[in-house]
């Protein structure tokens, strides 16, 4: 038993998340000066690109699958994937199924690979398992025309409108 004000807590974060096409409308779960944890549910393609200038963004795909398009190319995501979006990266997703993501923003910071340690099946992390976006047919077939980019800087949102799709990389 417990005596005093300390009590175990458990909550279903998915119940906190309303459905939105913008990751900047994610429900905040925990936040301090270094990190912002939120939960985001979306079931349709993002109508605008997103760019976070405050820090690196890590998405953990709790449920769902779809396609992610960013400055570096395209790749398909699915349940259980971690997606790292470095600060300043423009990106959007097109879910094929309702997608629930945990968003972890490293405010004024960045994510780094862990120190090398144990190798093999007992390793905490295997860099060989990393995947990167590709400049494939899906990336090249994106809709052209006017695109909006929602930019988060110092916690505030601004919108930039381009007369073309700014996700137009030809190599990296």
PLM regions: where:
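Jelly-roll (double-stranded beta-helix
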Residues: 1-172
């Amino acid at each position: 038993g417990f005596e005093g004000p300390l009590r175990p807590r458990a909550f279903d974060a998915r119940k906190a998340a309303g459905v939105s096409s913008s990751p900047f409308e994610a429900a905040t779960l925990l936040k301090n000066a270094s990190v912002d944890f939120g939960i985001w549910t979306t079931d349709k393609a993002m109508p605008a690109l997103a760019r976070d200038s405050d820090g690196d963004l890590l998405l953990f795909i709790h449920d769902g699958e779809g396609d992610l398009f960013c400055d570096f190319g395209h790749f398909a995501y699915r349940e259980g994937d971690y997606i790292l979006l470095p600060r300043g990266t423009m990106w959007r997703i097109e879910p094929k199924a309702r997608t629930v993501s945990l968003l972890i923003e490293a405010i004024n910071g960045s994510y780094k690979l862990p120190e090398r340690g144990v190798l093999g099946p007992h390793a905490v992390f295997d860099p060989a398992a990393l995947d990167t976006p590709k400049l494939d047919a899906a990336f090249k077939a994106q809709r052209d025309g006017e695109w909006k980019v929602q930019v988060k800087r110092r916690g505030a949102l601004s919108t930039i409108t381009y007369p073309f799709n700014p996700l137009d990389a030809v190599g990296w």
